Design a protein with these regions (language model features):
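N-terminal pre-Walker A segment at the start of P-loop NTPase domains
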Residues: 84-124
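Conserved lysine of the Walker
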Residues: 143-144
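Conserved P-loop NTPase "ATPase switch" module shared by AAA+ and STAND
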Residues: 184-206
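Structural recognition of the conserved hydrophobic beta-strand(s) that form the central parallel beta-sheet
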Residues: 194, 218-226
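Short regulatory helix/loop adjacent to the ATP-binding pocket of P-loop NTPases
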Residues: 228-242
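Accessory nucleic acid-recognition modules appended to NTPase machines
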Residues: 307-517
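Conserved catalytic cores of phosphodiester-cleaving nucleases, focusing on short active-site segments
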Residues: 498, 517-542
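Domain-level recognition of nuclease-like catalytic cores that cleave nucleotide substrates
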Residues: 565-593
Length: 593
């Protein structure tokens, strides 16, 4: 049995042992009657607990089984090769080597790998390039898991030449340099540095990794959540000396295949991270509640930007965001932009009083619901709803801000959100006015958007007019609002994933004086295009494709973008063709991109 298999089996035994009762069974005779007790020691204290007669036999069997497994585990430990001297005392940072790495990586061995894992594998075992590999992205997007998977698949020979270093905020580049020299002198070849951007002097001194250690044959993998820090470094200290792998964007296809969760609604609710309750990774979803979503925005996004700017060019690169940072309002401004990212102009989001566009859209749709029109949202105290929503999201309103937010603030925050891959712009084009252009900004982590939408529903529940409705009426309104939110999010998801998956084509929304095509995919090389409507519905209705069969709209489109080779409605139902319109399941569409 190889050492790796032995270690895995030992871990399984240890888990079984932990499920069985420790200690022994003792018998006591009291007034002529025999009583049995479970005796064990915990934290240097002896404990006893009475064992009922009806469970005595099964409990004794469990005690014996634990003793047998403990003996088996003890024998296996003797089979492990003696660890080579590692001079652990010589390390000043947190370094893991040898058998500790097998234990560290054992639990992820059965996890499915992300598609980008192959790039990491190729770097470790491919031709030496004198470069470092940078694995970066927002929190909980699978970076450390990928490193552990790389360690888990190593053979024993490679593992004994590997080291994992967990960087903390107290570490320095000088201390890390000393430890790397020790590892190099002992023949270590693979070194993984996790959360390396916590080093205050990382950005200014990162050339050390490529120029000294990678150049001498060491395969170095750098990982961290401060994406901007890596981008600043790649532009200067590690220019042309690094390979970048960004983990932030997680398409529906990977969310489904890696986490094993099926359904576009689940992706809308939780998509964006590699964590979901009960599935492989963390114990609870990152976006399971408003509190978790807020914490993620503050730590994974706002802190990411602030920490990287603080460490870059000796705090001289805040540009126009310096006043916001000094007054502790940068987090608030970033949070506000993230919440209102679907607004067309970032400047308006930052300078106008906070308004819920989700609420306005839902009110319009409820009024025109053909089967059960409801105008209840017209009578809701919108000012109170807005105030409660603002409080829930902990966003400073314009009247509370002590610094003026101008175009420079808005533009710079948007630049950094783009660099983090959190936001992406989708073109909106117009016919017949071809010179009129705008953009639609989408969020790459749908779960974050949905968590904030849930806060909107909570604020609605507090409104007196809304609460006066019967339970069935309240439920109907809530479900309709969430459906509208999901519908808007589904459009963003399809547009974003199509744009990323088809770099040689142009993906955009095409608007007319009346109506629009939700998505157009234009192939410049072929001189043709495809037009789409995107619906959250599972049902088919002619109303859904009315624009696709509008002869005037189609003629204008073909004049500008060539023949229309396909007309599609992406929805949640089954594939079929109706009146020349191809209805396609949206999950299958995303799965095959």
């Amino acid at each position: 049995m190889e050492q790796s298999e032995l270690q895995v089996h030992m871990n399984e035994l240890a888990q079984k042992i932990a499920m069985l009762p420790p200690g022994s069974i003792v018998k006591k005779t009291v007034t002529g009657r025999e009583y049995y007790y479970h005796r064990w020691t915990e934290n240097k204290k002896r404990h006893e607990k009475y064992i009922p007669a009806e469970v005595l036999d099964s409990f004794r069997a469990q005690i014996e089984q634990r003793k047998e497994l403990e003996q088996e585990l003890k024998a296996m430990k003797k089979m492990l090769p003696k660890a080579a001297p590692t001079h652990v005392a010589a390390f000043t940072t947190n370094v893991r080597i040898g058998a500790a790495l097998r234990t560290f990586s054992a639990s992820v061995k059965r996890y499915k790998k992300r598609e980008c894992f192959q790039q990491l594998h190729n770097f470790l075992y491919g031709e030496a390039q004198d470069k470092v590999f940078i694995l970066y992205g927002l929190r909980r997007t699978g970076k450390t898991t990928m490193i552990r998977q790389a360690l888990a698949e190593m053979n024993d020979t490679d593992l004994m030449k590997s080291a994992f270093i967990q960087i903390t905020a107290q570490d320095t580049l000088a201390a890390l340099n000393t430890d790397l020299k020790v590892l190099e002198s002992q023949g270590f070849q693979y070194v993984f540095l996790d959360e390396v951007t916590l080093l205050d002097d990382f950005i200014e001194g990162a050339a050390l990794f490529s120029d000294i250690f990678a150049a001498s044959g060491m395969r170095i993998v750098l990982s961290g959540t401060d994406s901007l820090g890596f981008l600043f470094t790649e532009d200067e200290q590690l220019y042309d000396r690094c390979i970048l792998l960004h983990t932030t964007f997680i398409p529906y296809r990977e969310f489904e295949s890696v986490l094993g969760i099926h359904g576009i609604d689940e992706y809308i609710r939780y998509g964006g991270t590699m964590s979901l309750g009960g599935v492989h990774y963390n114990e609870s979803s990152t976006f399971a509640s408003k509190e978790r979503a807020d914490e993620y925005v503050d730590t994974a996004i706002a802190h990411n930007i602030q920490h990287s700017l603080r460490c870059y060019q000796y705090e001289d690169h805040f540009r126009n965001l310096r006043d916001l940072y000094d007054k502790n309002e940068l987090t608030s401004a970033i949070n506000r932009v993230v919440k209102d990212i679907n607004h067309r102009f970032t400047l308006e989001v930052l300078t106008q009083d906070f308004k819920s566009h989700d609420l306005g859209v839902s009110a319009n749709n409820l009024r025109r619901d053909r089967s059960n029109p409801i105008d209840i949202l017209d009578h809701i105290d919108l000012s109170a709803v807005t105030d409660r929503l603002r409080d829930l999201l902990e966003i400073l309103n314009k009247s509370e801000q002590t610094v003026v937010l101008d175009e420079d603030h808005a533009a710079e925050i948007k630049e950094y959100l783009d660099l983090l891959d959190l936001t992406r712009d989708i073109d909106i084009r117009h016919l017949p006015k071809v010179n009129t252009k705008s953009t639609r900004t989408v969020i790459a982590q749908p779960g974050l958007r949905y968590a904030q939408a849930s806060a909107l529903i909570h604020s609605l529940l507090l409104d007196e007019t809304f609460s006066a409705l019967s339970l069935p009426e309240r439920t109907a309104v809530q479900e309709r609002i969430l459906t509208e939110i999901k519908g808007r999010m589904l459009e963003d998801i399809v547009l974003l994933e199509t744009k990323i998956a088809t770099p040689g084509k142009e993906v955009f929304v095409l608007q007319f004086p009346i109506g629009e095509f939700d998505m157009v995919v234009f192939d410049p090389a072929a001189g043709s295009c495809q037009i789409f409507e995107i619906k959250h519905s599972m049902e088919i209705a002619p109303f859904q494709y009315r624009h696709l069969i509008d002869s005037e709209k189609c003629a204008q489109t073909e004049h500008r973008y060539g023949p229309i080779t396909g007309k599609f409605v992406l929805y949640r139902g089954e594939d079929q063709i109706l009146n020349g319109i191809q209805y396609q399941n949206v999950e299958e569409y995303l799965r095959n991109l």
